[in-house]
From Swiss-Prot:
Ranges of compositional bias, category Low complexity: 52-73, 91-124, 166-199, 207-224, 291-339
Compartments it resides in: Nucleus speckle
Organism listed in the record: Dictyostelium discoideum
Alphabetical GO biological process terms: mRNA splicing, via spliceosome
Free-text domain note: The Q motif is unique to and characteristic of the DEAD box family of RNA helicases and controls ATP binding and hydrolysis.
UniProt-listed InterPro entries: DEAD/DEAH_box_helicase_dom (IPR011545), Helicase_ATP-bd (IPR014001), Helicase_C-like (IPR001650), P-loop_NTPase (IPR027417), PRP5/DDX46/KHDC4_KH (IPR056149), RNA-helicase_DEAD-box_CS (IPR000629), RNA_helicase_DEAD_Q_motif (IPR014014)
Protein name from the UniProt record: ATP-dependent RNA helicase ddx46
Source organism phylogeny: Eukaryota, Amoebozoa, Evosea, Eumycetozoa, Dictyostelia
GO cellular component: nuclear speck; nucleus
């Protein structure tokens, strides 16, 4: 701020700015912004503008007519910059200044009290050139005059508040003031505006009396407020930051003290009212006692059969009649009928306590029993007891209507209501809490609850009358109707569509032929869906026609939109669902991430169409999901487990499935494979039978398809591009490399692809995911990790960050292989090789979506050779080149299998029974099969026919061994002519026993072994290789029981022991340990007098024993057949008991 600005501010410290500013409007067209830093100090001048302008309207009228910009009064003297002002007033000569001052209307405003002082001041010298502005509080030059702010003049005889200085004058201003130049005094005297003259406006501009009276009434209050505000600002301006902090603390303490005082006053008020209530109760009790005493005296003098009736008396009455009172009927009704009492409140209570003199006390009629047969003393005692009872009842009634208790009872009711609401919101906890509650001592109770879910969800459709609904909305356009069958077949072959089923509609060529609404067409144009894809062109007409459908298409082909668009048309044709009625469309998905993705895609259209959607999945807050369902939802996207929880919660009062007419199963093959089968059937059975059911997936094995078709009604199967085929837009690379080199190769790929887009890395295990995340983070790569052990919040944030490109690398388990749609995902790396074809197709299908190009790398180690056949099949079906190393790896594996070596079998993929991820799950399945066979009385037969490959291998080995046995037997027949009398053993093909062979025995060989040798044609000169093959044949054919029976039949001839075998290889680890421990078997051996020996080797379920080896079994020997069988049955009981105890159950045991 320069010197002239400070001088102008000090000159106007006590003047009326509004008057001088109106004159300045004539010469200055606009108000500048050069002096905005002065506003904080002078803002208290703004509020009194109306006061001066109203009283001086006549003086300012002419000046306002020529005003170009209606600025505030005090701002108009800021139009010139400090440099222009300095040049106009100081750098020019005095004549030039005078001429310029006369030509312009600019006159510095100054109060009249200061005019005389200004005229007497001498000249001042011209100040030096203006310096650059530094700060608001920079030191000013010494030549600036100092004038204390003075009180403005009284205008229209109205009091004006006394202006106080904004801040104290600094020390540098307390110097000798220099006189002003004479020329400056002269021009001030000549150009003094008439606004400062003390005169009243002309009568024509006189304000109305009423307005003046109102203004005079409002002015003192306004001035007082202004004075307080100015004083506060002046104090704050003078204080330092430390003082301001102290002042704030003081104000805070004052506010706290005020609150304490208010609280103390409130407590004192409540105390007074409580005392009043207690006093009122005491007085009422005294009056009741008096009234009861009078009634008691009356009852003692009355006849035995007389009814004593008490009337309403006042507290002022001191005497009561002792004779019976006769009251008319109307008066009796009035006396016996209690008046309606108004609810008491604290607000209606008066401040001062008043004696309850005229308070009416109601007394009830008391009927005394007849006292003819009762002594006088007894009668007196009876009447006294009745009176006491009456008093107690009256006291209890008074307690019930106690005012303070009534008030507190209302508060308790409100608190209980809020508590009930909070309990309702937390009625059911998350899935994790349900699992924790199911552990420990409540296992039995929780199993009962879970078992009851099936019964709770069971619906008798015959007893429910469902409303009719429309399925068929499709109207074929003339263009499609005129197409011939040949043209339709050509168009379908062009789309790559194959159809199974009857009466399938013709495929559409554009969105206009689909029969969609106008809003949907606009949304499709907005989201840039130009034309239908192959799967959309054929499935949309079929779904709009009301048919059940199985849709199979490649990843990224638009399957989600294929069922969403017909679903919207289906819902809009039905009445809107009211709160509590349930949803109309239900979409189920196997993973939470896919459910969220479908929900987001659905909301793009539902918001415009006016439909309500809800997403129900595990891991999230169940209270929010319940609230959404109670408000009403037309579309619900869910996972099966959480949906069952909500359907069964609160006795099925949250929602129901009665209005569901459109059911969608996305990734349906995975739904029936991941153990969701019982849950899916449980939900589907609760939906009306005439629903429309849609299934979509990129892979659909035939076995799963057979299971899925059970819930469909005459479905159409539409395959676009093939079944379990990788898209041709994806470039696939498979590298055979050791485990140690995989990470180094991954770093090389990241260095190439890191800046090209987003990257997704798949692993098979959660531990591998965490380790790889740690290694990449140490290598300075920003990445994310995703697997099932993470919280749902972390999983949602991970997917969101990856889609929003916060970080461009995601390491995930196969959890992310289903339905995850990332637009800019350019690279997929299978760090761990997929274990079956369908998993490989879904992993690789995360890239190359919606017509974009993608790249996929797969690492396979020599130890994972069993997976090579699935990858080769995927490469051949998609038309990609198969590396030579991969073919060599597969050939080596097939060669080992043919030779019968110890190799691991590759999983067969989705079989409809649950994917076999590890040996533990396979053990569980085998145990269940064994228990089923035992329940049907089948113990020693082969496995079920579902295990086709294993059975085929066994049959091949058996056929080869049988041919060799026949050749050996034919040779022996030629050598031994005594074959007339032969014994054919049932159950063993091609085995005969001749009498001569039984007589040819070796005393060094046990009798049982000799019999076995005779059965299988094994002589002492037989080679060990042939003997091994024959024993292997017997083991594979499952004839161990027949051999044991034969031993038991032959051995008694020589008085030897009996033998039994019990295979325990397929039981759980706990069961195997139990029956092989000496302590557990000691009791059995002592009781049955047998010997039990563990033999064989443990083999995992997916391994076949090599020739000459057997699975783990128990060898039981005993003196009699009964003892051996008893020992075997006891061991089986132990195995079954341990197996049932340690059998692992799933999360949802509905069936």
């Amino acid at each position: 701020m320069d010197e002239y600005d400070k001088k102008r501010r000090l000159e106007h410290g006590g003047s009326d700015r509004s008057r001088s500013s109106n004159d300045n409007r004539n010469s200055h067209g606009s108000s500048g912004n050069n002096y905005r830093d002065d506003r904080k100090d002078d803002r208290y001048y703004r509020d009194d503008r109306s006061h001066y302008n109203n009283n001086n309207n006549n003086n300012n009228n002419n000046n306002n007519n020529n005003n170009n910009n209606n600025g505030n009064g005090y701002r108009d003297d800021r139009n010139y910059s400090s440099q222009n002002k300095y040049q106009n007033h100081h750098q020019q000569s005095p004549p030039q200044q005078q001429q310029q001052q006369q030509n312009s209307s600019y006159v510095p405003s100054q109060p009249p009290q200061q005019q005389t002082q200004t005229q007497q001041q001498p000249h001042i010298q011209a100040p030096p050139p203006a310096k650059p502005r530094k700060s608001r509080f920079d030191q000013a030059p010494e030549t600036i005059p100092i004038q204390a702010p003075q009180q403005p003049p009284m205008i229209s005889n109205q009091p004006i508040f006394k202006q106080q200085p904004m801040y104290q004058q600094p020390m540098y201003q307390q110097k000798q003031q220099q006189p002003q130049p004479p020329i400056f005094q002269q021009q001030q005297k000549q150009q003094q505006p008439p606004i400062f003259q003390h005169h009243q406006p002309p009568p024509i501009y006189q304000q109305p009396p009423v307005y003046q009276q109102q203004q005079q009434q409002q002015q003192p209050v306004f001035q007082q407020q202004q004075q307080q505000r100015v004083a506060t600002e002046a104090i704050q301006f003078q204080q330092t930051p430390q003082q301001l902090a102290i002042e704030q603390e003081r104000l805070k303490q004052e506010r706290e003290n005020e609150k304490k005082i208010e609280q103390a006053n409130l407590e004192e008020e409540m105390k007074k009212r409580r005392e009043k209530v207690e006093q009122w109760r005491k007085q009422k009790l005294e009056q009741e006692l008096k009234a009861s005493g009078s009634s008691n005296s009356g009852s003692t003098s009355s006849p035995p059969t007389t009814t004593t009736t008490t009337t309403k008396t006042t507290a002022a009455t001191t005497t009561a009649t002792t004779s019976p009172l006769t009251i008319p009927s109307q008066q009796q009704q009035t006396a016996t009928t209690s008046p309606i009492k108004k609810k008491w409140s604290l607000e209606e209570e008066e401040e001062t306590a008043q004696p309850l003199v005229n308070t009416n006390i109601e007394q009830k009629e008391i009927k005394l029993p007849p006292t003819a047969n009762i002594p006088a003393a007894a009668a007196t005692t009876t009447s006294a007891t009745i009176n006491t009872t009456t008093i107690k009842q009256s006291i209890e009634e008074d307690d019930d209507i106690d005012p303070l208790d009534a008030y507190m009872e209302n508060l308790n009711k409100e608190a209980n209501l809020n508590l009930k609401k909070s309990k309702t919101s937390q009625m059911i906890d998350d899935d994790e809490k349900l699992e924790e509650e199911s552990e420990g001592e409540d296992d039995g109770k929780d199993k009962t609850i879970k078992k009851g879910k099936k019964e709770m969800l069971h619906t008798d459709h015959t007893s429910i009358k469902y409303a009719e609904f429309q399925k068929n909305f499709y109207i074929e356009v003339p263009v499609l109707a005129n197409m011939t069958e040949t043209e339709v077949l050509d168009f379908r072959s062009e789309l790559g569509v194959k159809i199974t089923g009857k009466d399938c509609p013709k495929p559409i060529q554009s969105w206009a032929q689909a029969g969609l609404t106008e809003k949907v067409h606009l949304l499709l144009k907005k989201f840039q869906y130009e034309k239908p894809t192959s799967i959309q062109a054929q499935t949309i007409p079929a779904i709009m026609n009301g048919r059940d459908l199985i849709g199979i298409a490649r990843t990224g082909s638009g399957k989600t939109l294929a069922f969403l668009l017909p679903m919207f048309r289906h819902i809009l044709a039905q009445p809107k669902s009211a709160p509590g009625e349930g949803m109309i469309a239900l979409i189920m998905s196997p993973t939470r991430e896919l459910a969220l993705q479908i929900h987001v895609e659905c909301k793009k259209f539902s918001k415009v169409l006016g439909l309500r959607t809800a997403c129900v999945y595990g891991g999230a807050s169940i209270s929010e999901q319940i609230a959404e369902l109670k408000r009403g939802a037309d579309i619900v996207v869910c996972t099966p487990g959480r949906m069952i929880d909500i359907l069964c919660a609160n006795n099925r009062r949250i929602t129901n499935l009665r209005r569901v007419t459109f059911l969608v199963l996305d990734e349906a093959d995975r739904m029936f494979d991941m153990g969701f089968g019982p849950q899916i059937n449980c939900i589907v059975d609760s939906i009306r039978p005439d629903r429309q059911t849609i299934m979509f997936s990129a892979t659909f094995p035939p076995k799963v398809e057979n299971v899925a078709k059970k819930i469909l009604n005459k479905p159409l199967e539409i395959i676009a591009g093939g079944r379990s085929i990788v898209s041709s837009d994806i470039e696939q690379f498979v590298e055979v490399r050791p485990t140690e080199t995989r990470f180094r190769r991954l770093i090389e790929l990241l260095s190439i692809w890191y800046h090209k887009g987003q990257i997704l890395i798949f692993t098979n295990r959660q531990e591998t995911t965490d380790n790889l995340y740690r290694q990449l983070s140490n290598s300075q790569y920003q990445c994310l990790s995703l697997h099932g052990s993470k919280d749902q919040t972390d999983r949602d944030e991970t997917i969101s960050d990856f889609k929003n490109k916060v970080k461009t690398i995601l390491i995930a388990t196969p959890l992310a292989s289903r339905g995850l749609d990332i637009k800019d995902l350019n690279l997929v790396v299978n760090f761990d090789c997929p274990d079956h074809l369908e998993d490989y197709v879904h992993r690789v299908g995360r890239t190359g979506r919606a017509g974009n190009r993608g790249t996929a790398y797969t690492f396979i180690t020599p130890d994972e050779e069993r997976f090579s056949s699935s990858i080769i099949k995927a490469l051949e079906q998609s038309g990609s080149k198969v590396p030579d190393e991969l073919r060599k790896l597969n050939d080596t594996y097939e060669k080992k299998r043919k030779e019968g070596k110890d190799v691991l079998l590759a999983p067969t993929g989705f079989t409809g029974r649950g994917h076999k991820f590890d040996a533990a799950e396979e053990d569980k399945k085998n145990i269940e099969r064994k228990q089923q066979r035992k329940a049907y009385g089948i113990e020693e037969e082969e496995e079920e026919e579902d295990e086709d490959k294993e059975k085929a291998e066994k049959e091949k080995l058996a056929a080869a061994s049988a041919e060799k046995e026949k050749q050996l037997l034919s040779e022996k027949e030629k050598l031994d002519p005594a074959t007339t009398n032969t014994i054919v053993i049932p159950g063993v093909d091609g085995t005969i026993i001749t009498p001569s062979s039984l007589l040819q025995t070796d005393p060094s060989v046990p009798v049982g072994q000799q019999a076995i040798n005779q059965i299988f044609g094994i002589s002492q000169v037989t080679s060990s290789e042939e003997a091994i093959k024959k024993l292997q044949l017997a083991a594979q054919l499952g004839m161990k029981g027949n051999i044991q029976k034969l031993n038991n039949q032959i051995t008694p001839l020589n008085q030897t022991h009996f033998i039994e075998e019990l295979e325990i290889n397929d039981y759980s680890q706990q069961a195997r340990w139990k029956v092989t421990h000496k302590d557990a078997l000691l009791e059995i051996t002592n009781f049955t007098n047998t010997t039990i020996t563990t033999k064989g080797t443990f083999f995992p379920p997916n391994k076949i024993p090599a020739p000459g080896e057997r699975k783990l079994y128990l060898y039981i020997e005993g003196p009699s057949d009964a003892s051996v069988k008893n020992a075997k049955s006891d061991i089986k009981k132990i195995l079954d008991e341990v197996q049932s105890t340690h059998q692992s159950t799933g999360k949802y045991s509905v069936f």
